[in-house]
UniProtKB/Swiss-Prot annotation:
The keyword Membrane applies. This is Galactosylgalactosylxylosylprotein 3-beta-glucuronosyltransferase S. Residues 1-53 are cytoplasmic. One of its GO terms (cellular component) is Golgi membrane. The lineage of its organism: Eukaryota, Metazoa, Ecdysozoa, Arthropoda, Hexapoda.
Length: 409
């Protein structure tokens, strides 16, 4: 019962009690004008009033106890309705109305046209009945960004009925990336969704969360309930069989991921065809200790949970996302031959700082290919040119290094 109803019931009972008291009060006033001494109320009247008070207090305590039990036992699937306030503060949601806080999403470009003629030696028409895989890739500007997206794209080019959601962690759209994604010929959406500034100074920073949240928002805005959601980082390595496996997902499917932490693997423990536990070297109280690449979700199932989201809490993104969709152990579908095969690897490219070439701007004209080449590399975020910093550009000929001015002048 709500507190408003409880207050209403208490007020109405007290009013009834006042009505019962009024005859005695008026009798006392009328007797005060006479010399005849007044008599106290009948003992049964006093007992009745006390009994009512006891019943009211007991009822209120009982309702309070029921409410506390309900709040304790009920599993709130909304991120922001968390088990403790500290955890809730990391969700990036307004605790009052569960709206995203200070998040920006901008669609740079998208295409729903599949310009690939053949996939796996079959025409597109052979695949029209397959559910679409929405492959979400968070990415961020760095020297390796374009090479890794290019490598990933040449895996995805083999997969029919796939829409690639590329979410970049920066403020402005990258025109070069727009051109690159369009050139691949598969359906895609390119969006920018920078991490809110309040989380950027955290160590470790919740990298990729704003991008995945942006993709979830895009799916929600398009009312997509038919298809499969998969979070695929740009530096992972994917077996083509993975996509056939996750396309069969009815609710939530799971499978092991290779090269994770100390064990070299993270994934479900399966007995008699059912997931019963998890193997992972970092549990840390997580109900679902799995890697982001180790599960897929059916959009029809996810649509049952309007508060689905992902928290800004490093290490707990997967766990709290899966909690937000009400996942239970008996709903998990093991894939990869009962989780005995590795279909995705958590490979990581060694990152280096932005390259720097010291070269006067006058040599970046059309006298050689270097002007256009270095311009393209700058657009990719791989290297940059400067006239005052970095190592002076050397050009070799016949095994000998020469100042660039000697060759280009």
């Amino acid at each position: 019962m709500s507190s408003a109803r409880l207050l209403e019931s208490q007020t109405s009972d007290e009013d009834n009690e006042d009505i019962e008291r009024r005859p005695h009060q008026s009798h006392s006033r009328s007797c005060s004008n006479n010399t005849t001494p007044t008599h106290p109320p009948h003992p049964m009247v006093r007992k009745g009033g006390v009994a009512r008070r006891i019943c009211l207090i007991g009822g209120a305590l009982f309702l309070l106890l029921v409410a506390l039990c309900y709040l304790t036992l009920s599993g709130d699937t909304r991120l922001g309705g968390s088990e403790d306030s500290e955890e809730g503060s990391h969700h990036g949601l307004d605790s009052m109305n569960f709206r995203p806080l200070n998040e920006t999403v901008h669609i740079c470009s998208e295409s729903y046209e599949d310009r690939r003629q053949f996939m796996q030696d079959k025409p597109q028409s052979d695949y029209v009945q397959l559910p679409v895989i929405y492959f979400v890739t968070p990415t961020y500007p760095r020297r390796e960004q374009i090479p890794e997206l290019t490598r990933l794209a040449h895996t995805l080019l083999h997969i029919p009925r796939l829409h690639w959601l590329v979410a970049d962690d920066q403020e402005k759209c990258n025109d070069y990336m727009d051109t690159l994604l369009y050139r691949f010929g598969m359906p895609f959406t390119h969006m920018v969704s920078p991490m809110p500034s309040k989380f950027r100074n955290e160590k470790p920073a919740p990298r990729g969360v704003a991008n995945r949240r942006a993709a979830l928002q895009w799916i929600r805005q398009h009312n997509l309930t038919n298809g499969i959601l998969y979070f695929g980082d740009d530096d992972n390595t994917y077996d083509l069989r993975l996509f056939s496996e996750i396309r069969k997902t009815q609710r939530v499917s799971m499978f092991p991921v290779g090269l994770i932490a100390d064990y070299g693997v993270s994934g479900p423990v399966v007995r008699k065809g059912k997931v019963v536990a998890f193997l992972d070297s970092w549990v840390a109280g997580r109900r679902w200790p799995v890697d982001m690449a180790g599960f897929a979700v059916n959009l029809e199932y996810m649509a049952q949970y309007p508060y689905v989201n992902m928290p800004y809490k490093p290490g707990y993104e997967e766990d709290l996302f899966l909690r937000s969709i009400g996942l239970q152990m008996n709903l998990i579908e093991p894939r990869g031959n009962n989780c005995t095969e590795i279909l995705v690897w958590h490979t990581q490219t060694k990152s280096k700082k932005l390259g720097m070439v010291r070269l006067e701007s006058k040599y970046l004209d059309d006298r050689s290919n270097l002007g256009a080449l270095l311009h393209n590399l700058k657009l990719m975020g791989v290297t940059s040119t400067t006239e005052s910093e970095g190592r002076n550009a050397l050009i070799s000929k016949n095994g000998r290094e020469n100042p660039h001015s000697k060759i280009l002048s």
